[in-house]
């Protein structure tokens, strides 16, 4: 058995090395209607047949040799490929009589990918559909979406749109297991995924082979169906609670959200999902990709809230600079009114120019909070364009509760989106902003206010259409801002996206970051860093951890080392009154933050995220932690003792790469020894430093 295991490992790592060496490909069959798109890890064959239409003939995981289109039984059909309603007419890709093949082409795609486009023309309806299939080097993933064009002379209304429909499974139904909620929570195999199910993991409980289904539709618009009792996958928009509807004018094209399906195998080296998914999402789905280096961000919201002043800010800037932070953000309170860039001169009597100068003198960049669609009735745009207001089901203007009182909600499916984009873009240019926290109610909020817009005369023809159109409006605003300021970091908060603690691929397609939560951390006994880590761990398989800004950990709350180590697992973010930190504590932060920045520049730790200990529900009586590692095995670990009485814990990582590694305690500065990848796979005991409840470990070759 040992010989077989070693041979399997050799063959597996050879496949991975070939995958990294070989380019991706699209191969076209002799008749021009058969295409194979893939790399050395995964390969999908798509065909067009006049009788069967467009369909997936095979989809192989080349690491194992499994064709996941056949594994559940030869009696199954391939699936519809895509489907939607156009007015009352149902159209599915696999209905051969409904389509005429028009053309196919291949093009290069960043990063290191190929794109296959297949264009079809409906026979009975003036509609063209283009199906897009993308594959990227070294990722066992095929990404898919469609575009629908109205070739007719009258408006067409789309609904019930599935952009990926395929009978794909890693095994027969009686051996399948499903994990939803970012791939972390067990569910039944006949399952409907919604807002918190941007990624759903389906695996074979006998072989460990599985697939991760990633739906890039935004917020509540997403729906993922694991059909029947293990009878295939549909990646789609919602049809009932947040129903998708989209009108297409003559000549107009609608491009759907994207689907990504990744293949993985538990415990099989870098084919394990904890390597596959973080590598793919951080390199392909993150807006800034592999070039991204996460800044250390400070934000004034807690404890100062709207009481932040010039004097307090200047003191905080000095402390933040000494700590080695990169972005100093003034949250709500700097502006005179929501929806206007005028400064609140009662709090910042000299404006923000001197604040910007002070921040940049300390080697940082300024960040600001802005509301997107919630604006003050005092603003010019509110007075001059009441027709752009969102309206409720009774036709009344919508208002939303904020820390500044009730504010009007503007509909982003109107020309207001252009006004909002210009306002934020002007603000970025005026103050050389590195980061913008874009906040508050859009489609709806996270606190029970009703969604959507019922107004007449907007770009939506119905309430249902307003839902998707408002998300499109957010994308329009961010696209316009990035066009003017490509290097800025846009944070689209959970309140803007409309759900507590939500983050998804639709959000990451529109922005860089997500202020995920406001964890209370203001006093002894508050929820604090353990709850922040709970949010992190449950999302860390599906979501690039550095896109999550988990407020509101306060840097001055003891134990400060727990706040620091927790921040290293996500997008590093601090709040708090930095003036309460002693100079020695500020210097301590600075030393550790400089260490982390150096590590992050030298080691791509975004390639793998591994929760440790009692991670699925961290508790006071048990330990938890995480490892962030490159595919070469270098990186860092954070171990949290909590209130357990443990002096040491065993760290075991079943897919740790081969090699010899030097491990150093960042907390004490001492080298703990050299360890092999095999030792990490079997388990290593690490002691907590006597003076800390936290251990930070650096792992280098």
Residue ranges and their predicted role:
Residues 673-701:
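C-terminal beta-strand-rich structural cap/linker in extracellular carbohydrate-active enzymes
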Residues 21-38, 42, 55-233, 242, ...:
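Polysaccharide-binding surfaces and accessory modules of carbohydrate-active proteins
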Residues 41, 146, 251, 298, ...:
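Conserved, mostly hydrophobic/aromatic
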Residues 570-571, 575-614:
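Aromatic- and carboxylate-lined catalytic core of secreted/periplasmic carbohydrate-active enzymes
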Residues 616-658, 692, 696-698:
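Carbohydrate-binding surface patches
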Residues 378, 382-415, 468-580:
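Glycan-recognition surfaces
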Residues 291-425, 431, 435, 445-447, ...:
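Aromatic-lined carbohydrate-binding/catalytic grooves of carbohydrate-active enzymes
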Residues 41, 246-265, 691-700:
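Short Pro-Gly-centered flexible turn/kink motifs
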